[in-house]
Amino acid sequence: MFYPEQFDVIIIGGGHAGTEAAMAAARMGRQTLLLTHNIDTLGQMSCNPAIGGIGKGHLVKEIDALGGLMATAIDHAGIQFRILNASKGPAVRATRAQADRVLYRQAVRTALENQPNLMIFQQPVEDLIVENDRVVGAVTQMGLKFRAKAVVLTVGTFLDGKIHIGLENYSGGRAGDPPSISLSQRLRELPLRVNRLKTGTPPRIDARSIDFSVLAPQHGDTPIPVFSFMGNAGQHPEQMACYITYTNEKTHDVIRNNLDRSPMYAGIIEGIGPRYCPSIEDKVMRFADRNAHQIFLEPEGLTSNEIYPNGISTSLPFDVQMQIVRSMEGMQNARIIRPGYAIEYDFFDPRDLKPTLESKFIQGLFFAGQINGTTGYEEAAAQGLLAGLNAGRYANEDEGWSPRRDQAYLGVLVDDLSTLGTKEPYRMFTSRAEYRLMLREDNADLRLTEKGRELGLVDDARWARFSEKLEHIEQERQRLRDIWMHPHAENVEQVNALLKAPLSREANGEELLRRPEMDYTQLTSVAAFAPPLADTQAAEQVEIQVKYEGYIARQQEEIEKQQRNENTVLPLDLDYQQVSGLSNEVIAKLNDHKPNSIGQASRISGITPAAISILLIWLKKQGLLRRSA
């Protein structure tokens, strides 16, 4: 039977991608349905209890700048906050938080259940309703049919999921959850390229069985960082320490002696695992010269005895897992309460997607998260937000939107996936972005909140705070420009005490702040430049904008040059066989990738500058040379 109500957007899956997609579509005013196999696992952290990190924290800030959920949820659930790369430049500084799993899940579910225009329904989805290459709905396990104008697939590792522990394996979406077999088979019938990937998780340890007295603690930062631009440290729950231990030669011997019992080394697992989060078996074999690997013992929550040993993901048999765990310092009597495992699952080639994350072959069908070949909560959530907002725009017959590479790490992520695809689980790093200086955590709102408001994602409270911050930044920069200090002024000694060499010429506040030895706090401690801004976010922006002004201006020039190619549109139905002068290799790659723009085409491996020139000349001759806004 058909459900009596028709929806604008259906989201299939309630993980990190699905929850952000559902919130985004609903915030835009679209009637949204979130279908999940279990309402109690909405926002579940299936692997590590943490949010953020290098590159990942940048994505979380961007999600927040666009009105998303993840940063707010972790501010209410984070039990340890740290700034990584704090001693380095602002472009690569990143926030990371340990999470209380229960509090995080509660924060996500509360937000979903209080979001207008959003309905949640518990039923596994087994089929899509596709008519004339357009998706128009979904069918659940009980045969209930839901109609919608757009559908977003955010099914994580559930598609034909297979869990491996040693040489034994069984079907599962993750430990304790069934896989999605019927939907996987249905999707394989569509004109989409599909492959298999693998990921894994470590065994969980009973904290009461660990001797923490012999281990080094790792505490969070003081003052405690905050993730959301709308957040404050008062929202954080009680803070906890992590602890550090190490593998050793005994650990490595156990692993080497049991490789024949590893499903990966025995050839049972076909899927490729994440390069930057390898299993402990992989680490020991790939880095044979290392006699120890650092392992972080991370608490899973304030009310839980579970410890997540970050760094020993494994699919070795349980008896070997016990030997590995007990070989490490402080863990000699450790008890495993959940075994580690590897999971294989279907993913679909993201080169078959537009930059909006809509399928090139099935209209109205969007993909987000691990189904696109990514790994990580943050990567999934960022894609979910983008897919949800574009599904909402599609349902309203509006043009889709995707950020450029110079606008957001989300733009880098989507461009990498849709242009290059991936053969292994894709993880975000700051090194993937050409314009890192522009794409900092601290300015995510300055880059994206205005666009989020235009798209209908940003509410009045966030917009008011953002507008106030902009005003504070401009007013403070103008104030500093207007205050001058002369070498012979009465209070010049206060300034000279902060400088490497005494002031030799008249300088205003911005010029003094630009000096490497001067920071904003020091400058505003001088009576002439006091008082400092009470708005600490705005104060941080003032310092960064002033100190890096020259570098930022140069990077902006590079972006403007590149933008010409990015804005030159390529028709998706163009047959590159028609373009005389292109080599067979180039023709094959362009027909395979179907790039959206000259800029995207230029990033495809094997596409030469000469080929781009030929293409531009041909487009001009054919009257097809046009640039998007």
Curated annotation (Swiss-Prot):
Q: Which InterPro entries match?
A: FAD/NAD-bd_sf (IPR036188), GIDA_C_N (IPR049312), MnmG (IPR004416), MnmG-rel (IPR002218), MnmG-rel_CS (IPR020595), MnmG_C (IPR026904), MnmG_C_subdom (IPR047001), MnmG_C_subdom_sf (IPR044920)
For this chain, one GO molecular function annotation is: flavin adenine dinucleotide binding
Cellular component terms (Gene Ontology): cytosol
**Main location group:** cytoplasm
Q: RNA-binding: present as a keyword of the record?
A: no
Q: Where does FAD bind?
A: 13-18, 125, 180, 370
The UniProt annotation places NAD(+) binding at 273-287
The protein's location, in the record's own words, is: Cytoplasm
Is Flavoprotein a UniProt keyword of this protein?
A: yes
Q: Which domain of life is it from?
A: Bacteria
UniProt keyword terms in alphabetical order? Cytoplasm, FAD, Flavoprotein, NAD, tRNA processing
User: Which SMART domains has this protein been placed in?
Assistant: GIDA_assoc_3
- One Gene Ontology biological process: tRNA methylation
**Cofactor needs:** FAD
What function does this protein fulfil?
A: NAD-binding protein involved in the addition of a carboxymethylaminomethyl (cmnm) group at the wobble position (U34) of certain tRNAs, forming tRNA-cmnm(5)s(2)U34.
User: Mind telling me which NCBIfam families this protein's record contains?
Assistant: mnmG_gidA
Recorded family membership: Belongs to the MnmG family.
- Complexes and interactors: Homodimer. Heterotetramer of two MnmE and two MnmG subunits.
The protein in question is named tRNA uridine 5-carboxymethylaminomethyl modification enzyme MnmG
List the source organism.
Serratia proteamaculans (strain 568)
The gene that this protein is the product of is mnmG
